[in-house]
Amino acid sequence: MTATPLHWSDTAHEVLSGDLNVAVAYVTPAGGAVVVSVSPLGLTDRAAGRIGFTTSLGFPRKLERILRDPRVALAYHTREHGFARPEDYVLAQGDAVVDMRPSPQRLDDVLDASDRFFGPGKSGRAWDWLLHEYRRARVYVDIDVRRMATWPDLAAYGPPEVTGPAWPDAPAEQRAPENGTAPRVDVARLSRKIDPLPYRLLAYRGADGYPVVVPVEIVGRDHTGFRLLSPPGLLPPGGRRAGLLAHSFRPQNVGLAMMTFTGWLTARSETEACYAPHTSTALAAPPNRTVQALGNGILAKHGVWRAGRDGTGERLRTLAGQQGPLGRRES
């Protein structure tokens, strides 16, 4: 953990401990950012200045990128179906440490937290076998929080209250990719898929290397991409690689739907931008808790089997063994 743990407010702590679904962003080797949704289950250690979430070996690319560059950000952007009451938008930036082999006690703690947020888990001989990898082959991602920014409303308008290092200046404009900045996927088709997903967040790499995640509205589209609106002061000028997330979820996280994009962001003003998507990935869970649990179990079993067969698990464990005290890889 950090030498001097960051201490955050009671309001922020309620949000960190109570949100059902948050956005997690990590940086890419090309200087962009990817943003996805996770359920952190209120995993916080306030005294240590640490937050976290768990994930599966079934998502190795996310883990590998975090292991190679541990600078991450978590955006607590909605109170829907959670336990927190404040209407603050909270952005936590920090350094991740990946625990590839959590202790049995840590895994038991996750199960207890899961019961609180997702409802009592399935049990019985068949379910225990099916969900073994989903429950016991988890990977812990701990984040030592370096900076926390809090806005007084979920739309993130106005100046933030910053705990930790001062908010950095806007990052420099990036060089356009060799293949150009225009959309590489069907914008009209993707727009129709995004329409039912109410939560939209944009992520880019900040000037100090940590991801910045901001809420945006998608207010239109044309041949150049999606037209975005953002609160004043949160869009960096110029063009750059960026990630976009659109997602939705129901109580106990049933029926989770998520679309993630990588692409090129061009700011047109302090509040308006064009986002040209280059890649897209979709995930949708069935709106039935039993069917979703069945799918989780099958996917986790397959992910663990595949990670063992193709060497992914060993490669990730090797990278994890090279982590420094703040997640930095040791040379």
Segments (PLM) and residue ranges:
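Charged, gly/pro-rich active-site loop segments
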Residues: 2-6, 83-189, 229-331
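Short loop/turn motifs at secondary-structure junctions and domain boundaries
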Residues: 14-19, 192-197
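Short beta-strand segments
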Residues: 20-58, 74-78, 84, 88, ...
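Short, solvent-exposed aromatic-acidic interface loops
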Residues: 55-60, 279-283
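A short, hydrophobic beta-strand micro-motif
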Residues: 69-74, 241-244
